[in-house]
């Protein structure tokens, strides 16, 4: 069986189209998992939702920004700006950006769909490996997520009690492959809003049979100049923030081999 697992599309159908084309170039997949952050912080909130919900055998989870669309929460809470006035501009820009996105989603009738997204998806692979897909970390669609700079001890606490052997997440936009005790943790990166130096879209292909599974991180180029032009034409209220991602102004990591692409993993459960 083969799964294509992606996350963090962030309202960028140009990047999504490039990834879907790459998936097709690799042969047929049995199912798609999309792990949240579909619409916000992008120039086109609606088209990616139309595209992913048209995929065959697709399952979805919510991301933190999907929840914000429903609840009205913001990534930076207004009360924080009272404690730190330097955050005031971030609060104002976040409110404008999320309000703009929510308006489009509401007009197109997508808010109820977002409101009903599950927190996680699960599957038992043919070899018995228990797979968990969630946006940020087990039990959460927000927070620090699964990050490469975190110690094994910190990640072990974050993964505790998840009842899975393999956990795949997004949220941080930085790919990662770590063995934490008996749990393998994979961060697939992001489709859009890159924060690693390659500025590519990244996603995971998972091949599994009764002997084990293989995970491949795919890196996909897309036309970032076309994205910039689309942002400029979209009347998004904070275009410079979005364009900054496309121009590499928000790079957090050079991504120096944190992901062991193509590693073959055998079932590690006790016999």
Describe the role of every protein-language-model region.
Residues 23-28, 55, 125-127, 161-163, ...:
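Glycine-rich phosphate-binding loop signature in dinucleotide/nucleotide-binding domains
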Residues 6-7, 32-37, 59-64, 134, ...:
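Active-site neighborhood of phospho(di)ester-bond hydrolases with catalytic His/Asp-centered motifs
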Residues 178-271:
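Acidic, His/Gly-rich catalytic cores of divalent-metal-dependent hydrolytic chemistry
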Residues 26, 103-179:
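His/acidic metal-ligating clusters that form di-metal
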Residues 10-15, 40-43, 65-70, 166-179, ...:
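Active-site environment of divalent metal-dependent phosphoester hydrolases
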């Amino acid at each position: 069986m083969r799964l294509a697992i992606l996350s963090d599309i962030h309202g960028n159908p140009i990047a999504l189209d490039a990834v879907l084309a790459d998936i097709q170039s690799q042969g047929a997949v049995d199912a798609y998992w999309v792990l949240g952050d579909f619409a916000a912080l992008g120039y086109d909130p609606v088209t990616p939702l139309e595209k992913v919900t048209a995929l065959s055998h697709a399952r979805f989870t919510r991301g933190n920004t999907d929840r914000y669309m429903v609840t009205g929460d913001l990534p930076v809470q207004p009360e924080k700006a009272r404690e730190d006035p330097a955050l005031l501009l971030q609060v104002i820009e976040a409110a404008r950006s999320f309000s703009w996105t929510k308006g489009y989603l509401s007009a197109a009738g997508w808010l109820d769909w977002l409101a009903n997204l599950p927190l996680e998806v699960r599957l038992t692979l043919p070899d018995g490996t228990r797979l968990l897909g969630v946006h940020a970390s087990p039990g959460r669609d927000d927070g620090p997520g699964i990050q490469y700079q975190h110690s094994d001890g910190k990640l072990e606490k974050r993964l505790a009690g998840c009842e899975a052997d393999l956990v795949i997440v997004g949220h941080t936009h930085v790919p990662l492959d770590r063995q934490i005790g008996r749990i393998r943790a994979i961060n697939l990166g992001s489709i859009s809003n890159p924060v690693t130096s390659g500025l590519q879209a990244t996603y995971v292909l998972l091949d599994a049979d009764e002997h084990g599974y293989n995970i491949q991180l795919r890196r996909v180029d897309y036309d970032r100049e076309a994205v910039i032009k689309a942002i400029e034409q979209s009347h998004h209220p904070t275009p410079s923030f979005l364009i900054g991602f496309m121009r590499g102004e928000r790079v957090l990591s050079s991504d120096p081999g944190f992901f062991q692409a193509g590693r073959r993993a055998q079932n590690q459960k006790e016999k």
